UniProtKB/Swiss-Prot annotation:
Family (UniProt): Belongs to the phosphohexose mutase family.
InterPro entries: A-D-PHexomutase_a/b/a-I, A-D-PHexomutase_a/b/a-I/II/III, A-D-PHexomutase_a/b/a-II, A-D-PHexomutase_a/b/a-III, A-D-PHexomutase_C, A-D-PHexomutase_C_sf, A-D-PHexomutase_CS, Alpha-D-phosphohexomutase_SF
Protein name per its UniProtKB record: Phosphoglucosamine mutase
Taxonomic classification: Bacteria, Bacillati, Actinomycetota, Actinomycetes, Mycobacteriales
Keywords: Isomerase, Magnesium, Metal-binding, Phosphoprotein
Alphabetical list of NCBIfam families matching this protein: glmM
Gene name of this polypeptide: glmM
Length: 445
């Protein structure tokens, strides 16, 4: 049986894979596993969602499952995923649930569960919740033992007060275009940036339940790039559907990705003494240019597997203060337990305001190396990388690249392919080396 939980919760097409029945079962299982046993007070869960059309249906189902186990729900409505994580801690709730499929298309939806303190669940806890889903419900409470539902009317204001602390200086000189992806950031992001003093021009901030991520947001930045240039803005910020990501655009319309944002923030935090152990946490997908920029600043880069959960694990293990992904998931543990796109935007603009420098200038140390990616169909994606001929080809490329590039072989998580990625000083070199290794992989399949 396929595992329910993926790298970021449970996802699928709403009302097909992710049905109301499954949502209710997940709510029930989460309540049984995470509701604090023996608590003298009533147990509480925080539930939020993004604006997509299926959110109301799945929210009702999740809450029914939670209430059926005798756990109360604080319903916070449409808010960013990091807001639900923060409020789980702020309200001292037993757990939190966010109903969102992040940057995925509108027909999809997902369920993310946060444990006490707003932390993402570990694999063992997810496995136990999955077991409880398959077991089905046990004996349920009746009468006064059934969970109640309360709308948390102060949820947005509490979250905005919290993220406002990320703006370490006033942003009055700056004009920013904000692409809200018709998602959970549509109210929160413009309000947060205006409260810090920025002149805000929101775009794609009119969610109707159907238009989330539709040609907009952090995965479709063309309209933001055009808007920044046409308005003469200092920068643009793009969020995804649940606002845990932030990518940027400089005044010339050039995209500043998560790697470049991490470089800007790492250098700023090193200067202010906030960068714990002069260490940044990034995934294997970060460009070699990030490593070179950090090396020149004597900043160590700790590398993890793909996924912000692995970044979070390394941050917690080493008590580090900054980590993230090229995709724009940037984690600042002093401000939250997960990536927060609005906090990222505030910190980025604060650096611009403090220094008086443009975003293009601040991001200049990050020089992205040309990257070539080849997908190779294989019979067994788990073993082909260990074939002697493949290992020899990889070793030869690594020797030729030295410290001027890198090669990465990675089995796809969703397809029967191995991804061969090479970064080098020029694209021709990267392509030649990638083809050489891809040919060796293909020959073994």
């Amino acid at each position: 049986m396929a595992r329910l939980f993926g790298t970021d919760g449970v996802r699928g097409v709403a009302n097909r894979e992710l049905t109301p029945e499954l949502a209710m079962a997940l709510g029930s299982a989460a309540a049984r596993r995470l509701g604090r046993a023996g608590a003298t007070r009533r147990r509480v869960a925080v539930v939020g969602r993004d604006p997509r059309a299926s959110g109301e249906m799945l929210e009702a189902a999740v809450i029914a499952g939670i209430a059926g186990e005798g756990v109360d729900t604080l319903r916070v409505g449409i808010l960013p995923t990091p807001a639900v994580a923060y409020l789980t801690s702020a309200y001292d709730a037993d757990f939190g649930v966010m109903i969102s499929a992040s940057h995925n298309p509108m027909p999809d939806n997902g369920i993310k569960i946060f444990g006490p303190g707003g932390h993402k669940l570990d694999d063992a806890t997810e496995d136990r919740i999955e077991e409880l889903v398959h077991q089905g419900p046990g004996e349920r409470p009746t009468g006064a033992g059934i969970g109640r539902v309360v709308d948390a009317e102060d949820a947005l204001e509490r979250y905005l007060r919290h993220v406002g602390k990320a703006a370490t200086t006033r942003l009055d000189p700056l004009t920013v275009v904000v692409d809200c992806a018709h998602g959970a950031a549509s109210v929160a992001a413009p309000r947060a940036y205006r409260a810090a003093g920025a002149n805000v021009i929101p775009i794609h901030a009119d969610p109707d339940g159907l238009n989330i991520n539709d040609g907009c947001g952090s995965t479709h930045m063309e309209s933001l790039r055009s808007a920044v240039v046409s308005y003469g803005a200092d920068l643009g910020l793009a969020h995804d559907g649940d606002a845990d990501r932030c990518l940027a655009v400089d005044a010339h319309g050039r995209v500043i990705d998560g790697d470049a944002i991490m470089v800007v923030l790492a250098l700023a935090m090193q200067q202010s003494g906030e960068l714990v152990s002069d260490t940044l946490v990034a995934t294997v997908m970060s460009n070699m240019g990030l490593h070179l920029a950090m090396r020149s600043a004597d900043i160590e880069v700790r590398t993890t597997g793909v996924g912000d959960r692995y970044v979070l694990e390394e941050l917690r293990a080493g008590q580090f203060s900054l980590g993230g992904e090229q995709s724009g998931h940037i984690v600042l543990p002093s401000f939250g337990t997960t990536g927060d796109g609005i906090v990222t935007g505030l910190r980025l603009m604060a650096r611009m305001a403090q220094t008086g420098r443009s975003l293009a200038d601040l991001a200049q140390p990050m020089q992205t190396l040309p990257q070539v990616l080849i997908n190779v169909e294989v019979a067994d994606k788990t073993t082909v990388a260990d074939a002697p001929s493949v290992r020899d080809a990889v070793a030869q490329v690594e020797a030729e690249l030295g410290d001027t590039g890198r090669i990465l072989l990675r089995p796809s998580g969703t397809e029967q392919v191995v991804r061969v990625m090479v970064e080098a000083a020029d694209e021709d070199t990267a392509r030649q080396m990638a083809v050489r290794v891809a040919d060796s992989v293909s020959a073994e399949s």
